[in-house]
Amino acid sequence: MNSLNKKSIKDLDVNGKTIVLHLDLNVVVDYENKRILNDRKLRASLPTINYLINHNAKIVILSHLGRIKTLADKQSGKYSLEIIVDELRNRVSKNVNRVVFSPLNYGETVVQMVNDLEERDILILENTRYCDISDEGEYVGLEWDGSEILGQFWGMLGDIFIDDAYGVAHRQLSSNYQTAKFAKKSALGFLIVNEINHLDIALEVPKSPYLALIGGNRVADKIAAIEVLCERADQVIIGGGLVYTFLYAQGYNVGLNLVERNMIDDCNNILEKYGKKILICFDFLCNNDFSDTRPIYRKIDEGLEGLYGLDIGKRSLKFIKHEIYRSKTILLNGPFGVIENIKNYAQGTTEICKSMAKQTTRGAYTIICDIDTSSHAEYLGLDKYINFISTGGGASLSYIEEGVLDGLETIDNVPLNVLKKE
């Protein structure tokens, strides 16, 4: 059972059935050398894939990879899911029969390939986002904008549709919302159920003190989630790029940092309503550009004139670590500094992750629910010390805000009589 009251894979008889399986295989790829750099999303999908293999299913995989913006993106093969085939073949259950790839994802050839599948075969269809660009190079948005025709085609390819693509579960795409609508039967895979169950621990039944750490860049993307967390957590600490709009709203000089001026009133409203619960980071490691040179330390009271704030300062970090070590539930969403290839400004996020890992060993419940910080924690080797690391940032924020995921609306519901019994 899950709080969305949607059927899960174990509610259906998948034995010997043809399963259309929607996954988020948007892995990190070195496109120049055609190498997968981070396969965490693929690994997270394995429990569902292996369950289907071990139940003799015929599996048809839908997924996207990268952002397809032009005809050149499509024709170059740069974002082709073919790069996934060997990696998947090497990682799935040894009971698999064949793993094959289709350079198409629509049409009679695809139908024939599906019909030719044997038990324990896997067929990976080409990148679903290829459907967003026509052969003439026009944007048609069939996948992104949720084409019913495309969803009907994919939904009718199998006996059952299983959605396990958590990373896009908040978006109504053809490959989730429309495909489920036209499928004979549908359910959620293990990954999505696991993601929801872990978020529910932090949202519905958290141990107190409950600390929420919110970093990242855009206030507009996170303001609703911040308000929800202010209602539920004992303390919310705001850092990362979005902190500068909050500071600007309070009258501070934030230098060269981005300020979302259209969000100033929202920031002030949050601070006025929840001021006793919110801490805004108050000192920073700065520079006048984004080079990995020696940081310039500034307290916000001194102003950041001519500077970018690239990481939190030692005093903010000391306070955050103190709060982590006294908390029993800790949720982190978003890095607190620039962590992409700039070592001098990753220290704040690194120390936060290390402190969370240490507090996990003391019995706290810890969750990281954004892609960038999750990847950083894994890079540090700390992922095994955090209770749960999510595979989706936007989906987690949407679930925190609304308690639902729009892309999953059309998945079959658990019958009311079953809900009453439980």
UniProtKB/Swiss-Prot annotation:
Which Gene3D superfamilies does this UniProt record tie to the protein? Answer: Phosphoglycerate kinase, N-terminal domain
Q: What class of enzyme is it?
A: transferase
Supply one GO molecular-function term: ATP binding
One Pfam annotation reads PGK
Which amino acid positions bind substrate, per UniProt? Answer: 24-26, 64-67, 129, 171
Involved pathway(s): Carbohydrate degradation; glycolysis; pyruvate from D-glyceraldehyde 3-phosphate: step 2/5
EC number(s): the record gives 2.7.2.3
A GO CC annotation given for this chain = cytosol
Q: Which residues bind ATP?
A: 222, 309, 340, 370-373
Q: Which domain of life is it from?
A: Bacteria
Q: Which UniProt keywords apply?
A: ATP-binding, Cytoplasm, Glycolysis, Kinase, Nucleotide-binding, Transferase
* Biological process, per Gene Ontology: gluconeogenesis; glycolytic process
Reaction catalyzed: (2R)-3-phosphoglycerate + ATP = (2R)-3-phospho-glyceroyl phosphate + ADP
Localization in the cell: Cytoplasm
Family that this chain belongs to: Belongs to the phosphoglycerate kinase family.
PANTHER family annotated for this entry? PHOSPHOGLYCERATE KINASE (PTHR11406), PHOSPHOGLYCERATE KINASE 1, CHLOROPLASTIC-RELATED (PTHR11406:SF23)
Q: How does it assemble?
A: Monomer.
Q: What is this protein called?
A: Phosphoglycerate kinase
Which source organism?
Ureaplasma parvum serovar 3 (strain ATCC 700970)
What gene makes this protein?
pgk
